[in-house]
Curated annotation (Swiss-Prot):
One of its GO terms (molecular function) is DNA-binding transcription activator activity, RNA polymerase II-specific. Residues 101-110, 119-134 have a biased composition (Low complexity). The gene is Barhl2. Keywords: Developmental protein, DNA-binding, Homeobox, Nucleus, Transcription, Transcription regulation. Pfam families: Homeodomain (PF00046). This is BarH-like 2 homeobox protein. The lineage of its organism: Eukaryota, Metazoa, Chordata, Craniata, Vertebrata.
């Protein structure tokens, strides 16, 4: 190293190179070290070892350069336009993810190191100028989350170097790509569901219409129940009706033997005679109740006595102090007691209001005796 410095008359250390670049040397700023000789170029390559934190991968940007070189971005007026510069920009629009490569992994061995190839200043400046721009643009959110085709095109260049800084981005891309098929599957399922929904709506609509038809049909035609066939009404002849009426006037209730005899005499069945008597008694009780009310309201107890020849009755003089409602209730009680029907209890008839008077207990001249046993009339024998 010392011999080379003595031969050339200048030092090529990092400090010397940077100080020379700051002083405005055109050869140093343009990066053209070929005029200084092969020894200087070798010294520069030996001292310009790649940094582990270098974010510029020359495998993706400049395939002809075997090592990565960190350079300051040149001034815009120093960059010359050329076809090669456009060629580099075209291939490095979207650089691969940043990676930190160890120095010993990228530094070529003396046996495997290819001979240095001369590069023009435009190519070096183009690669140096394009590197910072593309390296900063790859960290945008839209570039990380978006599905950009230039990144996919540069994937073969970036896969040649593995780095721990490169793993999260690959995982995020893989997660993003694995998330997209899930979204597509869910979209496909929703589309299938939407396609199936009209069919299900049609099915539901069809079942609803069928249910409505069944309801309307059930309303229009109610279910036929198994009813017993109604018996035909018996048409009695005049002779049969006259004989039944005469028997009813004599006897309101028939015994089993009397009913069978009457049915045989009239050429009827026992059931027909029994049914006729039940209907006739119902009609008779209704007519009698109405008649008793009318008689009680009118006070005509002589007609009541003629209608119901009973040994016990309520005398008009005893019932004269009661109102019409009480008299009608008393008459109905007498009527029910005559024909063996259970009397309906009246609130005013819970206790006996008037005593029962014997017909033969009347005094001479038709004057009633309230208590013929305790107050005998003179001239009448005392009953013993």
């Amino acid at each position: 190293m010392t011999a080379m410095e003595g031969a050339s008359g200048s030092s090529f250390g990092i400090d010397t190179i940077l100080s020379g670049a700051g002083s405005g040397s055109p050869g140093m700023m343009n990066g053209d070290f070929r005029s200084l000789g092969e020894a200087r170029t070798t010294d520069f390559r030996s001292q310009a070892t790649p940094s582990p934190c270098s974010e510029i991968d020359t495998v993706g940007t400049a395939p002809s350069s075997p090592i990565s070189v960190t350079l300051e971005p040149p001034e815009p007026h120093l960059v010359t336009d050329g076809p090669q510069h456009h060629h580099h920009l075209h291939h490095s629009q979207q650089p691969p993810p940043p990676s930190a490569v160890p120095a010993q992994s990228l530094q070529p061995s003396p046996q495997q190191q290819p001979p240095p190839q001369p590069q023009s200043a435009a190519q070096q400046l183009g690669s140096a100028a394009a590197a910072p721009r593309t390296s900063t643009s790859s960290f945008l959110i839209k570039d990380i989350l978006g599905d950009s085709k230039p990144l996919a095109a540069c994937a073969p260049y970036s896969t040649s170097v593995s780095s721990p800084h490169h793993t999260p981005k690959q995982e995020s891309n893989a997660a993003h790509e694995s998330f997209r098929p899930k979204l597509e599957q869910e979209d496909g399922k929703t589309k299938l569901d939407k396609r199936e929904d009209p069919q299900s709506d049609i099915k539901c609509h069809g079942t609803k219409e069928e249910g409505d038809r069944e309801i309307t049909s059930s309303r229009e035609s109610p279910p036929v129940r198994a009813k017993k066939p109604r018996k035909a009404r018996t048409a009695f002849s005049d002779h049969q009706l006259n004989q039944l009426e005469r028997s009813f006037e004599r006897q309101k209730y028939l015994s089993v033997q009397d009913r069978m005899d009457l049915a045989a005499a009239l050429n009827l069945t026992d059931t027909q005679v029994k049914t006729w008597y039940q209907n006739r008694r119902t009609k008779w009780k209704r007519q009698t109740a109405v008649g008793l009310e009318l008689l009680a309201e009118a006070g005509n107890y002589s007609a009541l006595q003629r209608m119901f020849p009973s040994p016990y009755f309520y005398h008009p003089s005893l019932l004269g102090s009661m109102d019409s409602t009480t008299a009608a209730a008393a008459a109905a009680a007498m009527y029910s007691s005559m024909y063996r029907t259970p009397p309906a209890p009246h609130p005013q008839l819970q206790r006996p209001l008037v005593p029962r008077v014997l017909i033969h207990g009347l005094g001479p001249g038709g004057q009633p005796a309230l208590n013929p046993l305790s107050n005998p009339i003179p001239g009448t024998p005392h009953p013993r």
